[in-house]
């Protein structure tokens, strides 16, 4: 355990009491996140509590991995880890238990997350502002992928935005380094990553030798969500999620995805047959810009080897045609309250309500406006 601590480049852990907790802004399997301020300087920060699943096993390897990755990644569009703090420990603590107790990761504070902003009907994004959001998101992905890091949990709630309109990729709790597989030795990463509604088809089919395309699928889901205001494919199970993907992106077959039949799950699951690709048709009621539709379509490609990467996505005509990307600062300045998914009122948390199976879903035209906004 001491060896694990020594590998983290923070020479000691300050006490978390140097920060005053102001509000809880997040909750999940990872633990809790609090808005706080430095008692002396007044600087606002976010405190992420490290969940000690089994303290006898020492410092959680997932938290250690997150810390190491965040120490490596320094970019305007990646959340900044300031330091690591702990609760007060015994005066008899030694080098082997100097960070015993509750551990907190301390980050620069961001006023909003994208899920919180999209859950608020009063927040209106112009096309130029959506372009800026996606440009910053893809810049962040380009940077982490160049540094051989996969995020593995791309979703709107993990996209933070500061009051000045700067986007930060956040929550690297599932992130990991990756390498190009050698023919004789394919990678064997876990495929139990990425929140279900944003999980790409290759992971749902059991792929363990994957790379950056898994994050780009999530980017495509998030981009569509900028218009639909809620996740576009809200499956209840992995098979249901694959069914929704097939209904939107077309049937999963070897014709559109060579060698997909190599997956054992592909043979076992009864996936929809004869489905045509409908990404543009289904989204055009929301997305009026043809370049935007084109980019979403190229990100939501079934075959990961044909999916657009972040570099090509940033060169898409969407970002280089009028209206050009514009800052979010002015729009955000009209909203004084922080907006996070965790704090969204229940009636606005449509993203948390699983979509009905296709054979039970009602005609959108027959739903009231609030229901129509919730389910794509």
Curated annotation (Swiss-Prot):
Signal peptide segment: none
Active site location: 153
EC code: 2.7.11.22, 2.7.11.23
InterPro entries tied to this protein: CDK, Kinase-like_dom_sf, Prot_kinase_dom, Protein_kinase_ATP_BS, Ser/Thr_kinase_AS
Gene3D superfamilies membership: Phosphorylase Kinase, domain 1, Transferase(Phosphotransferase) domain 1
Annotated stretches, region: Disordered: 345-376
Keywords for this protein: ATP-binding, Kinase, Nucleotide-binding, Nucleus, Serine/threonine-protein kinase, Transcription, Transcription regulation, Transferase
GO biological process: positive regulation of protein localization to chromatin; positive regulation of transcription by RNA polymerase II; positive regulation of transcription elongation by RNA polymerase II
Disulfide links within the chain: none
Pfam families reported for this sequence: Pkinase
SMART domains (alphabetical): S_TKc (SM00220)
Residues of the Protein kinase domain: 19-319
MF terms (GO), sorted A to Z: ATP binding; cyclin-dependent protein serine/threonine kinase activity; protein serine kinase activity; protein serine/threonine kinase activity; RNA polymerase II CTD heptapeptide repeat kinase activity
Keyword Phosphoprotein: no
Family: Belongs to the protein kinase superfamily. CMGC Ser/Thr protein kinase family. CDC2/CDKX subfamily.
SUBUNIT field: Associates with cyclin-T to form P-TEFb.
Protein name: Cyclin-dependent kinase 9-A
Organism from which the protein derives: Xenopus laevis (African clawed frog)
Lineage: Eukaryota, Metazoa, Chordata, Craniata, Vertebrata
